[in-house]
UniProtKB/Swiss-Prot annotation:
Top-level taxonomic group: Eukaryota
Gene Ontology MF terms: retinol binding
Protein's UniProt keywords contain DNA repair: no
The protein's name: Polyprotein ABA-1
Function: Has high binding affinity for fatty acids and retinoids.
Post-translation changes: Nematode polyprotein allergens (NPAs) are synthesized as large polypeptides that are subsequently proteolytically cleaved to active polypeptide units.
Transferase as UniProt keyword: no
Alphabetical UniProt keywords: Allergen, Cleavage on pair of basic residues, Lipid-binding, Repeat, Retinol-binding
Signal peptide: none
InterPro entries, sorted: ABA-1_nematode, DVA-1_sf
Amino acid sequence: TMEHYLKTYLSWLTEEQKEKLKEMKEAGKTKAEIQHEVMHYYDQLHGEEKQQATEKLKVGCKMLLKGIIGEEKVVELRNMKEAGADIQELQQKVEKMLSEVTDEKQKEKVHEYGPACKKIFGATTLQHHRRRRHHFTLESSLDTHLKWLSQEQKDELLKMKKDGKTKKELEAKILHYYDELEGDAKKEATEHLKGGCGEILKHVVGEEKAAELKNLKDSGASKEELKAKVEEALHAVTDEEKKQYIADFGPACKKIYGVHTSRRRRHHFTLESSLDTHLKWLSQEQKDELLKMKKDGKAKKELEAKILHYYDELEGDAKKEATEHLKGGCAEILKHVVGEEKAAELKNLKDSGASKEELKAKVEEALHAVTDEEKKQYIADFGPACKKIYGVHTSRRRRHHFTLESSLDTHLKWLSQEQKDELLKMKKDGKTKKDLQAKILHYYDELEGDAKKEATEHLKDGCREILKHVVGEEKEAELKKLKDSGASKEEVKAKVEEALHAVTDEEKKQYIADFGPACKKIFGAAHTSRRRRHHFTLESSLDTHLKWLSQEQKDELLKMKKDGKAKKELEAKILHYYDELEGDAKKEATEHLKGGCREILKHVVGEEKAAELKNLKDSGASKEELKAKVEEALHAVTDEEKKQYIADFGPACKKIYGVHTSRRRRHHFTLESSLDTHLKWLSQEQKDELLKMKKDGKAKKELEAKILHYYDELEGDAKKEATEHLKGGCREILKHVVGEEKAAELKNLKDSGASKEELKAKVEEALHAVTDEEKKQYIADFGPACKKIYGVHTSRRRRHHFTLESSLDTHLKWLSQEQKDELLKMKKDGKAKKELEAKILHYYDELEGDAKKEATEHLKGGCREILKHVVGEEKAAELKNLKDSGASKEELKAKVEEALHAVTDEEKKQYIADFGPACKKIYGVHTSRRRRHHFTLESSLDTHLKWLSQEQKDELLKMKKDGKAKKELEAKILHYYDELEGDAKKEATEHLKGGCREILKHVVGEEKAAELKNLKDSGASKEELKAKVEEALHAVTDEEKKQYIADFGPACKKIYGVHTSRRRRHHFTLESSLDTHLKWLSQEQKDELLKMKKDGKAKKELEAKILHYYDELEGDAKKEATEHLKGGCREILKHVVGEEKAAELKNLKDSGASKEELKAKVEEALHAVTDEEKKQYIADFGPACKKIYGVHTSRRRRHHFTLESSLDTHLKWLSQEQKDELLKMKKDGKAKKELEAKILHYYDELEGDAKKEATEHLKGGCREILKHVVGEEKAAELKNLKDSGASKEELKAKVEEALHAVTDEEKKQYIADFGPACKKIYGVHTSRRRRYHAEDGTDDIDGLAQSRQRRSGFFEKLIDVFAFF
């Protein structure tokens, strides 16, 4: 449909363009006209928009091709492509396959869409040639072979190019200017254009061949000889770029070289000359309009269309006169094309009384034999119109009895006068035959009773008349006789189809296509089918199986039917009313609806089979047996009408029959019943909130989460009471699921004193043995919560001495009351344990002096208590003895780690994870503070930071007081340092170097430091000295000193490297770059960057801002910026790897090495760099340069996975508001992860059909990505594996294997980006299908058997998860 195309292959159109196409369709415009308009819009595009549209249209063309030639041949083409076939081989193969198509409808599609698809597939191949064609650009041509143009015309062409007009449009405009010339101006322009064509020919065939052709011309060779040699030379060209030149410039050059002769020969076919001959029947006003159109540069096709429009408006004698004149023109053109001798031969054949078919065959044969290109163009230009003119008179005479006008007095006489007038107006307004037919059927469908019967008879008469015309009177009489003999409807229908299938005449086949569907409908609406169906109409049903509806609801349904709402919408409304019922009203409605379903079943399978099914049910057969028999009976139905009943009513009846049983079985676990049993501990307000959530359609998961939230808020006796109630509910569910006998067995095991592990294993075994789908759903729904409830009491009893409340009086007693209150409030507000711990450590870090010491002792006491609990008292005592014996810190630490590593109890391992990091910090703080005091901020302000201003010192002290991290303080100091210049900078550098030397001495020892100093004083090179320092630092094993290296090393390296590197790096500063590889920035952007640098913004922020400006560019501006940035990257590469290596890489690139080879060599060269400064360059500039060098290719490859394109494909299920929000997030620079999270959030909010639809769209996107990542062949292999019935595990393993084999970095990034979300999407459908009967009271009949097979693996995984917890 048009809507489908606009959302998929034409989604790149603007809303205005889409509306225009819809209007064209509604106005009855032909498919060709609409396609012409689409290609017009496409031709206006350029750059990325063009690429995006091309990709969309290519997908459409591929789908079309698959539909025409079949999947098997598409796979054959794909295999050819992957085997390395070039575009010519593929094109030839496609042409061959299309030429073998025999189906008329498919051949019509080839004719309709082939040219456009060829154009689309040719569009992208032009891109990479644009750089090499610079000597044939518009700009250079204006001073050479286009110099004859006026300045005004040149300016117009340049403006057109700037506005993104296509090459075709520019060429058309140039030829338009050329066609307007006369006399000497024309001669001059012709010479210049011929010169341009000669230059292009020389470039395409080579100078030697061009010289050979020139010599041939100068020797006096005939035009035909010369033309043949040129064609031969062009045909021998194999270079793709040059072949494109031939395609681009060939037609225009042929025109230029042929213009003088052809103008003399063609003058009698110009518009002007024709107005006095075969167009003399036009009015003066119409002639003036045509001349104006030609003057305005309208195409020949548009002029022809206008003439035929004027012709179609004529009637009677005026029409006859025009037909004769036009036939005369066609005869004249035919004589010119095939020659006078052949034309005379055809005329004699016509005069001899030859049939239309014979004559047509001979004309086609004569035209097919024409080889002259100019004459072949005549055939292309005038052939279609002449065929129409020659066909119009006969067909009008033959078809008049099927025109709208004649039909209004025969088989449409039942229409009212108003309806007849409306149809005539529609025809006058140019509405299509389809529109008129649809309107007639609409009027017919509105009829009832006798009026309907009368109309049916009239329409049947019309259909019989058409049938007689199509199959012939003899065959029609034979069919009538068969019908009268009492043959069944199926026999008659088969014979009619056979007769229609045997028709070969194209005009008659068109009748079948035009009237067949409507006649089938009319013959199907007969008395029999109406009599059979009347008891299933809405009206009759309102008094039978829909009598439970209120009068208001009945009226609403009747109104919907009157308004033309679809059957599906009516059914949905009825089920909506049904779903709103409760209690007895629900029971009553269920019985009535079941009665209706039984009545339909009886009609569909027959009374005998229905009785058999009833007996089976009454005999006590299981639901599964009964269901299998019903499915078998329905599957055996062959009557199309009855099969339609199954499709129409089957889903609803399945739902109705599933609802009662599931409600009866589950009532004791409903929310309502639970509020008085295992949820009786909730407050009334909480119960009301839950009931409201259920009423508002909240999911079961949301209700469960809310209950657990209320539970988690409880404390003390209230918590105990709730725990007992919930445990009671869990026991009740367990009993229902595993059976009373097994539940009693488990209870006895528990009472006998079995361990928690034994009991858990037995429960898991019992649950694993459950096979009933409903009960397995209970396990999935209630299992996690019940495990939580049963685990909570023990863990709370064991952990109570580590709760926040108890700790406030022991190892957290050093906190102020205000701080304690804040922590209790955070816990009450549901803050995570990590947040509470972070807050405590924040309070601790703020302490100083004795307060700090006191807190440290208390916290250490808490850590010792936890350690004792985790490793046991015996091991804790052993560790204490080791400490007291004077063991070193390293020995003690190793023993503690060993003891912790030996812990196997999961709860205790959780303690290690929860409290370990904080305790390590507490135990490390006291010693390190004592040893590090001479490197504190306070002491440093008077030594190596004395160069700071007082204001800066105060700022640093304030930051420390506010709890800022050491990294932030260091960054601030380096910021102040970077702002300095001149002597101030030198002074600060010396002070900081002094600090670094002091730290180095502390870390490596005085002896090693003195050794390094001597090495430096001896004149050792920077590299030698650096190597020795690295060696000394590497030899450090003390953890505290290694921390010093980590903390101060980077800054000291910077300070020591700053003077030299500043001298060496000046050519890569922001300031110098603004005049080189950043010169493409606007002055405003440059000023902004300088301001950012002045404000102390980091290099990363400046780089991000530059890339932001770059990403905003488009077209030529983007190209220019890319070139400048690439130049900067090349300069940096040369500096990093050296000029020799850079030259080697450039030679490799120029030799035509692949992108992969070049990339590998660059990576190898960078990997070999050992100089730290240069390695820093790689770290600083590498990512951006990779982006710049990768931007064109990756943008072209990835555009089909952009947010914008996805909104019309696999994200089309989002609301407009949601789409706008995502686009805004992208515009605001939100990360891909954030966008993905938002999309999944929207997805998670969906339910029912909306969820299913979204899942299918997202799965489609995932399949598209998978195909891109692993390749079409591998994707097809995976699809075949899935279709063969492979298990989920097998399929998953194969997908993982395929993904693991991917080595391309870009594709691996796709896996990283989209893999997690796609795994989630593919997981959601199965789980929803498994739970379907537990959520809305129906059984997933179709998936029942498959889900049993899958669940065994699922529960194994589920048990593994439970075992982990």
